[in-house]
Amino acid sequence: MKILLSNKFYYRRGGDCVCTINLEELLKRKGHEVAIFAMQYPDNIETPWSKYFPGEVKFKPGLGMLEALLRPFGTNEVKRKFTALLDDFCPDIVHLNNIHSQLSPVIAEIAHQKGIKVIWTLHDYKLLCPRYDCLRNGDTICEECFSDKRKVLEYKCMKHSRLASYLSYWESMKWNRERLEVCTDIFICPSRFMAEKMRQGGFDSKKIKTVCNFIDTEKCYGKDYTKRGNYYCFIGRLSPEKGVRTLIEAANALPYKLVVIGGGALAGGVKDRSWE
């Protein structure tokens, strides 16, 4: 089978990137032919498919700011290069991952219009929450945008900025639930919790499947794996939406120590237990 994988970055940057690259390796081992569509970026893995990648955009002041602001809505460069890749590779399936902002869901529409099956693995709550993490201003758990996307404007959830929140609101209006359901055959959620949230957000249950993220057991289980220590271990990015604070608080009531491995905005707070 010919499968086109898409993710905004194509290097081991974060969980979505790691999942995409690991999936590519697994599919190839299973005998499938795989192509990649991502954004141009200096750290990307070298690939012959990069000639189809749209240029890098940076969401900060500069000459490319206008292109960056338009990219979430589907720019001509993305449409042109993605269409060229589809025409040259002729995939049976387009498998999307984290595509918002740098690529945009316009690629799902293009694939659907060509009669190609579209699968979309979700790595956050962007289809439900314009901010993507269901945390109002990065702090308070909030699901109000499930039913009313205007709440992102009311609370200025995007970087406490009215402009950034306005752009996120219009992005969510353009790529609304009805439009995305038409061009996506299956939404894959890595947990039952996310799948339930998608249903609560009004997405068609028939299009929602739960497929947990996988690991390569051969890489995880070494010869000395039986030598276990008396501790729990968290490995991942140390940011508010990961629930690290809650985990550390819960660990105080557990019999073993907690080992935390990772970096991010909360790294300093994890070390000295200060969160401000």
Predicted region positions:
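A conserved catalytic-core segment of Leloir-type glycosyltransferases
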Residues: 29-93
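Membrane-proximal helix-turn-helix segments that form the acceptor-binding/catalytic region
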Residues: 113, 126, 142-187, 196
